[in-house]
């Protein structure tokens, strides 16, 4: 899997964000073994310490559970996954609204466009 380091935020935060998204999308299913820090660091082309910091954030979020003898697993707690999914969706919605405001649309017009798109998809 590819990682993209694309903005000015610290690298570990970007890695944690991308791993969060992969977990809630199901790339790493609930209860599944999570790759090791070294494997992920190698995939991302970063120092293992940087990836460890990202993993620490995932553990703090409750998305990944560490078992000393069995490694890391993705949480099976659906409420945790649902809350992270909702948070990510809210962040993307806010980014979308900011992008449309940069084009000169106010929030009401942006939300109207979003609603119209949703209605068109449902037809």
Language-model features: locations:
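A short alpha-helical element within helix-turn-helix/winged-helix DNA-binding domains
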Residues: 33-44, 58
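Extreme N-terminal segment that seeds HTH/winged-HTH DNA-binding domains in transcriptional regulators
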Residues: 1-33, 39, 87-123
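Active-site-proximal glycine-rich helix-loop-beta segment
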Residues: 45, 55, 62
